[in-house]
Amino acid sequence: MKKWGVGFTLLLASTSILAKDIQLLNVSYDPTRELYEQYNKAFSAHWKQETGDNVVIRQSHGGSGKQATSVINGIEADVVTLALAYDVDAIAERGRIDKNWIKRLPDNSAPYTSTIVFLVRKGNPKQIHDWNDLIKPGVSVITPNPKSSGGARWNYLAAWGYALHHNNNDQAKAQDFVKALFKNVEVLDSGARGSTNTFVERGIGDVLIAWENEALLATNELGKDKFEIVTPSESILAEPTVSVVDKVVEKKDTKAVAEAYLKYLYSPEGQEIAAKNFYRPRDADVAKKYDDAFPKLKLFTIDEVFGGWAKAQKDHFANGGTFDQISKR
């Protein structure tokens, strides 16, 4: 028994010595703080159990466009978890991510989805029920800046798509609608969380155009006695996307753990954590479990209405695009 005890102690000691300490950096968009705080703990425990290695994941959050620029400019992110595919494509165009990144994981590398809804003050004093209510005189709207925020670009395109569908796909009328909406915007923050703080903490505005997960978080954390969620008749299917940053993981030799980190988002535990943080899960079993948490509404996609992100970016958010045009007062 003594020999066995000594041998077991030595085995534990050698295993401890062989265990590696690994650090990853996840550069993410603005309102994913709570999601990844919870997910990172779960993945670290999973990886420890699978390999014996200790992995610590650091986080960086901000407007998705600004975050993509920081990775392009050299911040050593092992993975990016950004608001939309265009921002990952922008990094790929600079050679830091493989150009076929979107096909490396299921569902076009979007492990969870969301949509765009409205957050209003309790009692809905301005009677906001659908997109057309946002252009009424005297309605103060809060949304982030599409030049820096991925969520803001989803907001903008959701409004544009609604206007198209209610004006026989007339692009000029859709532009007039979105221009009228932005005339009612009181504050343009750089990111989605900043806009939430403007509306919730600073008390500015009658309605916040928000990620569904952000609106649900606000009502659940700050009280349903203060805010209400209004789900419009239709909105856009928002698909946040993820990728390893190839140049960084090759340099740091973190490819295996970085890939596993993203793949685990699709696991039952990863999907459960996404749902608990108010993202719509891809996994059918998890989605069924949380079915009552997510209202039914008509959803259109970026490809169906705008021809994909590259075209949407060029038409609407590049210099001289429709956002610049409607911003001229």
UniProtKB/Swiss-Prot annotation:
Keyword DNA-binding part of the UniProt annotation: no
Gene3D superfamilies reported in the protein's UniProt record: Periplasmic binding protein-like II
Predominant cellular place of this UniProt entry's protein: periplasm
InterPro entries given in the database record: Sulphate/thiosulphate-bd_CS, Sulphate/thiosulphate_BS, Thiosulph/SO4-bd
Location within or outside the cell: Periplasm
GO biological process: sulfate transmembrane transport; sulfur compound metabolic process
A Pfam family reported for this protein in Swiss-Prot or TrEMBL: SBP_bac_11
GO terms for cellular component: extracellular space; outer membrane-bounded periplasmic space
Signal sequence region: 1-19
One Gene Ontology molecular-function label: sulfate binding
Keyword Metal-binding: no
Ranges annotated as spanning the membrane: none
Function description: This protein specifically binds sulfate and is involved in its transmembrane transport.
Family, similarity comment: Belongs to the prokaryotic sulfate-binding protein family.
UniProt protein name: Sulfate-binding protein
Species this chain originates from: Salmonella typhimurium (strain LT2 / SGSC1412 / ATCC 700720)
